[in-house]
Amino acid sequence: METTNFGFIASLLFVGVPTIFLIGLFISTQDGEKSSFFSDSSKGKLGPKR
């Protein structure tokens, strides 16, 4: 019981966290310019601007 429950929670986090991150990144890029998705993600979206 405990091992299956832990595996279910682990798999849920493993799938859910990147999905939420990608959805948030997609929404943040949709807020700005749609055409500059790749340039924004490679420049200052993932890290702090210096």
From Swiss-Prot:
GO terms for cellular component: photosystem II; plasma membrane-derived thylakoid membrane. The keyword Metal-binding does not apply. GO terms for biological process: photosynthesis, light reaction. InterPro entries: PSII_PsbM, PSII_PsbM_sf. Keywords: Membrane, Photosynthesis, Photosystem II, Reaction center, Thylakoid, Transmembrane, Transmembrane helix. It is found in: Cellular thylakoid membrane. Belongs to the PsbM family. This is Photosystem II reaction center protein M. It comes from Prochlorococcus marinus (strain MIT 9312).
